[in-house]
Amino acid sequence: MHRWSQAISLGIAIAGIVAALWPRSYSRDLTGDEDPYRLFMGRRLIHFPIFWIGAALLAYVVLQATNPAWRYTQSATQWWLVRMDHIPWLPCGIDAPFTQSNEWRQVIVYTAAWLSVCSVWVGLTRRRSLRILLGIIVGNALLLVGLLAIQQFTGNHRIPWPLTAWTDYPLTASFIYHNHAGAYLALATFCAIALAVWFFDHGSRSFAKSTPASVLALAALLLVGFVFFTLSRGAILTLAVSTAILAGWFLLRWRVLPGIPGANPVIRMAIVAMFIVFVAVVFRYLDFSEIWGRWDMIATQGSREVSVHSRVLVRDAAIDMLKTQGLRGVGAGGFRYLFPEYVQNYPEIYEGGTLYWEHAHCDWLEFPIELGLAGDLLILGGAGWWIAFFVRRRAFWNALAVPLLLGCLQTVIHAGFDFPFQCPAILVTWCMIVAIAGRWIELEPSATERTEG
């Protein structure tokens, strides 16, 4: 990933946390009969466990960077690793170029995600603000869909400039790797679905004449359609499974919770009609041959299909690497440098045409390999806190939080056979969505409480 984009992401995250922590003054016009007061959000931040877990993870990665066990060395034609003296009982890393990948580059990415989560948690105090933030994510995804549509219609994947000036690879929307484009659009799809479900639910309860639910549902359908054109088979499969689970949850919720009316038949028919028109236009003007070709290879060759077989072997080599390096880790961002030592035991990997593997194509393996046992425990601790939070808050039937969490779960499943979390855009967005779901649960009563009240 490009350094400039990571620097911009970090700058936005820093600006966000500064704005979130800025003291807020409430005058008598806003407080009613109460005295004016100032609100300091730093107190809320220091009581947020994810703040401390994230800080510990960043400190851990910095410790890896300051205790390198290998040094990256390069000549005019090749590169290799040289062993270095280091403290053997501490986490270690690789002294590698910042321009390629090393612990300091990962500190930038992780800090952006950490600060973004903290900004959402302490800075957004109204549900409307959370909905606006989700709307921004959906709007950004729709802009990417528009760019992808232009690329499909023109057959030119070397747009837009200036992104093409910084890479020699064809682009899928603005992503270098088409699977990352698919994973990002699939994640944004569930943001659109979550907003549509909430507006439908809220409008039904308040007897509103109209809501944005229909527009958001069409946006979700549009995003689903263009996930296919990213040619990401992993994103398509996980999106299909997660959507089926969501449909089952929605039907069960409709039966379990009283007072949730069905959709207006006129609106339902309008959505169906617009969807039919959308499908007709897509099939009329877009070329599906590449999509069918990729799925036909899977259907006819199965696990012996070249890309699938190569990834299976890469997974086997990564498992070998995890067994020998998983205790202390090789350093955040260091997988690509040490992995060739293990690839040489699986020469069939090179039959796929890829001679250098930067990632394990399985985040479930790559993160433990890079971060080691201590880093894994920090991540699992953060995940455990979030799970306990949602269970304790009884978020099972929440109209907005559940679709968001299903979208996040979809990305986690996708990470089992690809590397979506190595893309900073996906990692930061995913972390923010989890925080948005958690903050929403805090600000909105559960569906059970509303029906009982």
What kind of region is each of these model predictions?
Residues 1, 177, 366-371, 402-436:
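Membrane helix-loop boundary segments at the extracytoplasmic
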Residues 1-139, 195-218, 244-275, 440-453:
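Transmembrane signal-anchor hairpin modules in multi-pass inner-membrane enzymes, especially those
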Residues 59, 67, 146, 151-155, ...:
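A membrane-periplasm/extracellular boundary helix in multi-pass inner-membrane enzymes
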Residues 69-100, 157-172, 292-316, 320-321, ...:
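Interfacial juxtamembrane loops and adjacent helix segments
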Residues 100-112, 174-194, 364, 370-377:
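Membrane-interface loop-to-helix entry segments
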